[in-house]
Structures are given as C-alpha cells and as structure tokens.
Amino acid sequence: NISNVTALDILGDVEALSEERIDTVVNMFLKDFKEDLIETKGWPNYVTAYKISKTCLNAYTRILAKRFAQFRVNSVCPGFVKSDFNCNIGIFTVEEGAKHAVTIALLPEDGPSGCFYERAQLSAF
C-alpha cells in the first residue's frame, strides 16, 4: 500500500503508463530512500522495497497486457508461501501457492488481461 500521491498518480494513469513512468516511480523511491524520507514521502514503512517492487511489477503487467493483446498477461500473489525467502514461516505450501498461479494461467483466451490476483481472486492494484 503506497500513499505517495505522485507515485499513485503516475501508476494509476493506465492510459499514460509506460516503462519510463514506472522507472520514474522507482527512481523517486530510491532518492527518498537514500535521503531517509520514506515515511515523510508516504512510502510503505514495512518491507518497503519489496512492496514497491511488487507494485511496479503489477504496473508492468498492465503495460505487457496492452502491448501483447493476443495473450492473457496477469500477475498473481500466491499468498504467504513457505519458502527459503521467509525461513519457511509462510502459511501456504508451495503446492497451494502454485495452484492459484496455474488457475490464472489457464484462464480462457477471452479471459481478463492486465489484472492482479491475490491467490485466485481478482484484486485492485
């Protein structure tokens, strides 16, 4: 969850969204991070870089969906999956997490594209 107004405006403008605009948000974040302005500028204050990277990945999903309209391009958060990354303290098994990604990958040809799913549920960016 990002409350940085400029970042929200840039990433929320779907029609004008571009790789350059995503880079602008990343560079704004990096500048604020280096200057210790994360909280002041409205960036997440917990697992900050991770959340920004996922937000930008979701924005990039929209770009790819538009660029490659003949394909279904979506992003999926599988949930808090047990993995080496989190010292295996996740809630879901790898199989449970993968199940939802496979479900989204197998959407019909006329299914949604440019969307974000939390597990198998359509979610807002």
Regions found by a protein language model. Give the residues of each.
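C-terminal helical subdomain
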Residues: 55, 75-83, 87-125
